[in-house]
């Protein structure tokens, strides 16, 4: 009986919505009654990049689909994305109503929090933790862990994907809790992975029936099976983060802690009256988002460079001229390495680590290019199409770092530039939802990419296809396991890398020092 009422209600809503007169909506594939474009969304999940390029080619800059009775807008042109998601950010910066379940289960996380007081407070907190000056404090973690990674690559080049995963996780755990990760196989890390894998099912757009029929959230809790698993995941995740936060607070009390995101947040806790549970949510968001994106980018970098040896050779010539063979590249070298910077930008553009960005939602109706955009529309930036837009990029299907030579803007300045023709890529989002960790992320990418290109030759293995579409689906897309040949460029480079690892020191704790109750 309850299900019948739900279905009838959905039909009524769809008919009422579609019968609105005098409004022209963006074109899109024909929607089925009740189900909307469920079939198309399943195709998107199976072959995201191909489907998104097809959508952009067929429907142009705007495409309207339907999650059940809910309108979904896919934006496929850089100009429209700039106009709508940046310049009209007051309308396009919220999160979908379907996310209310996610926001309730995992509160105080920007990925789920709609616009409002909590969102504004979180933006303020993350800015205080991750701003350009604050991010400089954490370069010591990035420097140390990159040296560990280089030495690991010398000894176990075949495990490069695990090496960059460990690097990314250790940097962000060090920055959040002043605890580093020696080994991905640590039992606590295994627990984190088991939780994250299941959480992915909840955060992937379209993964829940709720995304298509949000009215199901009104059912009795006993009839919502997704709640039980979500509650369990929430409890397990909080237990882990509470232990790390407790370990950090003991260091603060003993005056043995140095500046990190966590110690800064402890000070903010007192000022803003933030509970430990909320502090854990804030730090959990940093770890989940920061580690996954950095690891995915660096794994993708290995594949891209193996496919483009000429670009690697140009970067190595630049590095040898600026840095020489007797030391590692540092951040001080960055202004003098335009080709290395161009490679970093072009990997972002040519091989984005997401197909669709995290969904936004409209808080009011809007009209763009004569098309009506209803209130509560779910809005996705079509990252695949944006990064291959022929109006923005010459020969967009080619990997050409040279296109960014002369572009001296950092990623933050580029993302905020008022001219859509200037922005380098779209990895870091839009408008009020622009990634708060952009300065920390770019510092990690620069120091690792510059040192990898300086010290190693990365080449395609004979018989390995290196298909760029061969990747794991998710909010962030990682390459599936693949093989490349990684060798030090010469004994002189290897000697420097081993010497730097031998003298590199850190005095922060390890995962073994975290105790659970």
UniProtKB/Swiss-Prot annotation:
Keyword Signal: no
Obligatory cofactor(s): heme
GO cellular component, one term: membrane
Similarity comment text for this entry: Belongs to the cytochrome P450 family.
Subcellular location, principal: membrane
Transmembrane segments: 5-27
GO molecular function: heme binding; iron ion binding; monooxygenase activity; oxidoreductase activity, acting on paired donors, with incorporation or reduction of molecular oxygen
Organism in which the protein naturally occurs: Polytolypa hystricis (strain UAMH7299)
Protein name: Cytochrome P450 monooxygenase polD
Bilayer topology annotation: Single-pass membrane protein
EC number: 1.-.-.-
Stored CDD domains: CYP64-like
Gene: polD
Keyword flag Oxidoreductase: yes
Subcellular localization(s) per the UniProt record: Membrane
Keywords: Heme, Iron, Membrane, Metal-binding, Monooxygenase, Oxidoreductase, Transmembrane, Transmembrane helix
């Amino acid at each position: 009986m309850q299900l019948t009422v739900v279905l009838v209600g959905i039909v009524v809503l769809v008919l009422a919505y579609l019968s609105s007169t005098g409004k022209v909506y963006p074109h899109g594939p024909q929607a089925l009654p009740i189900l909307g474009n469920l079939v198309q969304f399943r195709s998107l999940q199976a072959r995201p990049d191909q489907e998104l390029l097809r959508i952009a080619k067929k429907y142009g800059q705007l495409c309207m689909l339907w999650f059940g009775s809910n309108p979904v807008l896919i934006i496929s042109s850089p100009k429209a994305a700039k106009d709508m998601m940046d310049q009209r950010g007051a309308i396009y910066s919220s999160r979908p109503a379907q996310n209310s379940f996610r926001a309730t289960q995992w509160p105080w996380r920007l990925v789920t929090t709609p616009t409002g007081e909590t969102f504004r407070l979180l933006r303020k907190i993350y800015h205080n933790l991750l701003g350009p000056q604050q991010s400089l404090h954490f370069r010591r973690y990035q420097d140390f862990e990159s040296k560990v990674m280089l030495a690991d690559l010398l000894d176990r080049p075949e495990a490069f994907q695990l090496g960059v995963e460990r690097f990314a996780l250790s940097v962000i755990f060090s920055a959040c809790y002043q605890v580093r990760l020696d080994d991905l196989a640590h039992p606590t890390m295994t627990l984190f992975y088991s939780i994250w894998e299941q959480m992915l099912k909840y955060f992937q757009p379209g993964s829940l029936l709720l995304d298509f029929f949000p009215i199901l959230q009104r059912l009795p809790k006993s009839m919502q099976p997704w709640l039980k698993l979500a509650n369990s995941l929430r409890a397990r995740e909080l237990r882990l983060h509470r232990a790390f936060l407790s370990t950090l607070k003991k260091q603060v009390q003993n005056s043995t802690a140095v500046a990190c995101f966590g110690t800064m947040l402890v000070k903010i806790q007192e000022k803003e009256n933030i509970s430990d549970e909320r502090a854990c949510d804030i730090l959990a968001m940093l770890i989940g988002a920061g580690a996954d994106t950095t690891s995915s980018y660096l794994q993708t970098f290995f594949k891209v460079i193996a496919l483009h040896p000429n670009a690697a050779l140009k970067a190595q010539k630049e590095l040898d001229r600026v840095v020489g063979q007797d030391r590692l590249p540092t951040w001080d070298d960055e202004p003098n390495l335009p080709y290395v910077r161009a490679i970093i930008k072009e990997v972002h553009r040519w091989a984005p680590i997401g197909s669709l960005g995290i969904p936004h939602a409209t808080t009011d109706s809007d009209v763009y290019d004569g098309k009506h955009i209803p209130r509560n529309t779910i809005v996705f930036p079509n990252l695949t199409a944006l990064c291959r837009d022929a109006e923005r990029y010459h020969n967009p299907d080619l990997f050409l770092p040279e296109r960014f030579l002369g572009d001296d803007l950092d990623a933050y300045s580029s993302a905020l530039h008022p001219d859509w023709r200037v922005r380098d890529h779209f990895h870091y989002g839009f408008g009020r939802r622009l990634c708060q960790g952009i300065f920390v992320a770019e510092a990690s990418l620069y120091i690792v990419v510059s040192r990898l290109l300086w010290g190693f030759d990365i080449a395609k293995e004979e018989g390995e296809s290196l298909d760029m579409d061969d990747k794991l689906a998710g909010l962030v897309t990682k390459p599936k396991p693949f093989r490349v040949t990684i060798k030090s460029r010469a004994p002189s480079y290897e000697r420097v890398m081993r010497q730097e690892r031998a003298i590199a020191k850190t005095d922060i704790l390890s995962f073994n020092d975290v105790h659970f109750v």
